[in-house]
């Protein structure tokens, strides 16, 4: 009986559809190349050879229709917030948002009527990367946190396949 169990364990892969889908989603994140202020410089340097986000499966895309991650990197004004929301709405599902920098998280030092005090007021934010500006290593850590969040989520929730499989 031990030989049969060893043969099954060595040749059969047991997993769920959620874990396979989440693994593939977390291994290929495509953020939109969208920078607003000084945090965008650090975002650009994170994609260069020294830090190389490509090794984590992060490939910057030029269009919101090709990306699944939006990085809000910088100060968002009240006039610009609807534009950011429109870009978010153009992204395909599932989509995630990273708020990069103190200005994107809480408005930063700009406590005026023209600056939005936090990106969560107009888009749902999944990961916060604090700093002014945050280092590329902090953005890399933010991507790792996002990958872990994706792996823990239910990929088939709300789909017709979920209603068939769910007990």
UniProtKB/Swiss-Prot annotation:
Its EC number is 7.1.1.-. It catalyses: a quinone + NADH + 5 H(+)(in) = a quinol + NAD(+) + 4 H(+)(out). Binds 1 [4Fe-4S] cluster. Keywords: 4Fe-4S, Cell inner membrane, Cell membrane, Iron, Iron-sulfur, Membrane, Metal-binding, NAD, Quinone, Translocase, Transport, Ubiquinone. Pfam families: Oxidored_q6. One of its GO terms (cellular component) is respiratory chain complex I. GO terms for biological process: aerobic respiration; electron transport coupled proton transport. It is found in: Cell inner membrane. It is a peripheral membrane protein. [4Fe-4S] cluster binds at residues 38-39, 103, 132. It comes from the Bacteria. Its cofactor is [4Fe-4S] cluster. InterPro entries: NADH_UbQ_OxRdtase-like_20kDa (IPR006137), NADH_UQ_OxRdtase_20Kd_su (IPR006138). Gene3D superfamilies: 3.40.50.12280. One of its GO terms (molecular function) is 4 iron, 4 sulfur cluster binding. Its main location: membrane. SUPFAM superfamilies: HydA/Nqo6-like. NDH-1 is composed of 14 different subunits. Subunits NuoB, C, D, E, F, and G constitute the peripheral sector of the complex. NDH-1 shuttles electrons from NADH, via FMN and iron-sulfur (Fe-S) centers, to quinones in the respiratory chain. The immediate electron acceptor for the enzyme in this species is believed to be ubiquinone. Couples the redox reaction to proton translocation (for every two electrons transferred, four hydrogen ions are translocated across the cytoplasmic membrane), and thus conserves the redox energy in a proton gradient. Belongs to the complex I 20 kDa subunit family. This is NADH-quinone oxidoreductase subunit B 3. It comes from Rhizobium etli (strain ATCC 51251 / DSM 11541 / JCM 21823 / NBRC 15573 / CFN 42). The gene is nuoB3.
């Amino acid at each position: 009986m031990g030989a049969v169990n060893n043969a099954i364990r060595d040749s059969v892969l047991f997993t769920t559809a959620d874990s396979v889908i989440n693994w593939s989603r977390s291994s290929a994140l495509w953020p939109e190349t969208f920078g607003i202020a000084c945090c965008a410089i650090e975002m650009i340097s994170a994609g260069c050879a020294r830090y190389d986000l490509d090794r984590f499966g992060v490939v910057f895309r030029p269009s919101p229709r090709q990306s699944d991650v939006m990085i809000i990197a910088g100060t968002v004004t009240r006039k610009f917030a609807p534009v950011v929301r429109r870009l978010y709405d153009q992204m395909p599902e599932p989509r995630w948002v990273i708020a990069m920098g103190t200005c994107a998280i809480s408005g930063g030092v700009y406590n005026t009527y023209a600056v939005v005090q936090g990106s969560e007021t107009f888009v749902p934010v999944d990961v916060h990367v604090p700093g002014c500006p945050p280092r590329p290593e902090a953005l890399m850590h933010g991507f790792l946190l996002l990958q872990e969040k994706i792996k823990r989520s239910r990929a088939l929730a709300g789909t017709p396949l979920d209603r068939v499989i769910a007990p």
